[in-house]
Amino acid sequence: MKPPRRKFLHLAAATAALPSVSRMAWAQSYPSRPVRFIVGFAPGGGGDLATRVMAQWLSERLGQQFFVENRVGAASNLATEQVVRAPADGYTLIQLNVANAINASLYDKLSFNVLRDLAPVASFMRVPNVMEVSPTLPIKTVPEFIAYAKANPGKVMFASSGVGTTIHMSGELFKAMAGIDILHVPYRGLAAGGYADVMTGMVHVTFDNLPPSIELIRAGKLRALAVTSTTRSQAMPELPTVADFLPGYEASAWYGIAAPAGTPAAIVERLNRELNAAFADPKMKALIADLGGTPLPGSPADFAKLFAEETEKWARVVKLSGAKAD
């Protein structure tokens, strides 16, 4: 039996194994009815909005409705379980993101293994987080924050939207690489008190997703220090990267699409081709930029490789942090 990582990569490469005539027949008949995109988070977030953009694109390209269904709960695990159990016919898809990679080590009792039970289709967007501090603090740069934290060990706090979220893990990675002692304060979403506490200085810093932070930063309610990607963000190009000060640091959110394992390779191939076509469309590129993201094109094998690498990376951070969700 193949290990989960190898099986996931094998599923991604399986398209090439089908005869070309068979692949063409599958591609021409699909889709013949509406297709569900399952999203494991509430409507309105960056990943949800990006998935809706992609669903609309596929609806227009393939002549059938691709609609988003939000299945909220357990950091997207409920949604993943639903899709794993769905028929492998291409009519139920899931938005995968970095949370799924983190969950693999954060939860001990998952009933599924993404690397074994899903077939990668395509990645489509990468979005950085942004390191932002309270404007009440005398801190304007990443080095100044590190110096402040070292001068106040165990007294500096960072807010997140919950245990195991990308915001939490971004902070844990920063903590480890900077060699500082800062305390994690989880909220049920930053909008549920987290933003207010950082603004007033009750909590000192957060590593929030960029899209919901932009207006707060521009209004002066939060002070941005850097983005967590390896390159500057087009949405806020004036900000440096954390990696400028901590070489090797990277903690971007990313989004992609997968289907139940066993989905015909021709369907995976066609969906991948149509999604990649979106990145050549000026309107689509502008919509992704409006969400603070950059396109993330590639083959199913590319997405499988990204997911496997991210699963291993965040497993190390989860272990280092001691975080557990069950």
Regions of interest found by a model, annotated:
Residues S20-S22:
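N-terminal signal peptide c-region/cleavage motif recognized by signal peptidases
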